[in-house]
Amino acid sequence: YIEQYGQPSSTADCSDHNFIGADPSVPKRTWQAWYDQNVPAKRIVFLSTSNVVIEQAVRDGIGLGMLPVHSVHGNPDMIQVMPPEQAWNVHLWAVTHRDLHRSAKVQAMLGLLSAI
């Protein structure tokens, strides 16, 4: 997408670009208010209820989209267009059974989640 249409240099430039969005039937994402303020409805060219489909649409060059940083980290084909805003952060709670909390498998998973 960037090779064909260029990269927005500011938030104001976003109104000149195509975007991938979340279907309105999905509960509001943390970044939805930013979309509502900065992306004209006519520039949202693809909607999905699935994060996996949204990510694939961005990878396929259909438009720009909001993706978790960890899902594209280390992928040379993906370019971070703008830094994430603090308001987009999502808190993740990991709950375990108290008898399993100290097991190696659970600790490994908690370590992986905390690295994200």
Language model: regions and residue ranges:
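C-terminal regulatory
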Residues: 1-92
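A late-sequence structural motif
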Residues: 84-116
